[in-house]
Regions:
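Macrodomain-like recognition of ADP-ribose-binding/processing modules
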Residues: 1-261
Length: 261
């Protein structure tokens, strides 16, 4: 019991030090909450607005310890555990938090700046992935982009850092303004899937998990987006890739993909 209590206290002290470092770095005044959950939220909020720069190893060690503890708390989902629920191998369908998946790569639906979501505690997939991976991910994206914008339909790859996934594939899908995608936007969405699979093949990856690119705030209709996703992935000439996971969050997306697969 004493060891458990000591471990909990060490973890809370670690979060407090991480918050203090980022608050000082960002010149933000904040009161550190007493609740462990609220401390985690404050740390995430500070991470979400962090301007990319070099970070000291001491901070990274503290951050990594906390994020890996959070990953363990959520539970890691392996490919093997998904295969028992396979709709049709090698294409798997899973509903849940993509940051739990232990695939070679997960796909992030990014924006054109490709530096993550800057809105504190926002629940978009971009924010969730960056928050779980750690600040190294934003720095890696910053170093790759060099102030450029990522073209719609293009993608690039980074390490996954504190995620169970080894890599993250960042792609930008089309934004649909009137719920009726044009032929160009449909091709751009297909390009997102092709480009991610090309990068996966180039890097010798064997498994990849796709989120529902461009649905949600980008307003691509869910049914048509899923049709494009499934047809594009199935038609892609795979060599190294053995397992493709379609990851969904909403019940309606699960029903759509289940019917298509």
């Amino acid at each position: 019991m004493k060891k458990i209590r000591s471990k909990i206290m060490d973890r809370q002290a670690n979060i407090e030090k991480s918050i203090a470092y980022l608050a000082a770095d960002e010149q933000v005044r904040c009161r550190i909450p007493s609740s462990p959950g609220e401390r985690q939220r404050l740390l995430r909020a500070l991470m979400n607005v962090w301007e990319p720069k070099e970070l000291p190893e001491e901070f990274l060690a503290m951050q990594d310890a906390e994020l890996q503890a959070q990953a363990a708390d959520k539970g890691v989902v392996t490919i093997e555990s998904l295969k028992s629920n396979a709709v049709n191998n090698p294409f798997l369908l899973w509903q849940g938090d993509i940051t739990r998946l232990q695939t070679d790569a997960i796909v992030n639906a990014a924006n054109a700046q490709a530096l993550g979501c800057w809105s504190p505690l926002h629940n978009c997939i971009d924010n969730c992935i960056h928050s779980a991976a750690g600040l190294q991910l934003r720095k890696a994206c910053y170093d790759h982009m060099q102030g450029r914008l990522l073209a719609t339909g293009d993608a690039f790859i980074t390490r996954g850092y504190n995620l169970p996934a080894k890599y993250v594939l960042h792609t930008v899908g089309p934004i649909v303004t009137d719920d009726r995608p044009t032929k160009q936007q449909e091709e751009q969405l297909a390009s997102c899937y092709r480009r991610c699979m090309e990068l996966a093949e180039e890097n010798g990856l064997e498994s990849i998990a796709f989120c529902c690119i461009s649905t949600g705030v980008f307003r691509f209709p869910n049914q048509r987006a899923a049709e494009i996703a499934v047809s594009t992935v199935k038609q892609f000439p795979r060599k190294n890739l053995k397992t493709i996971v379609f990851n969904v969050f909403l019940d309606k997306d699960y029903a759509i993909y289940r019917a298509l697969l």
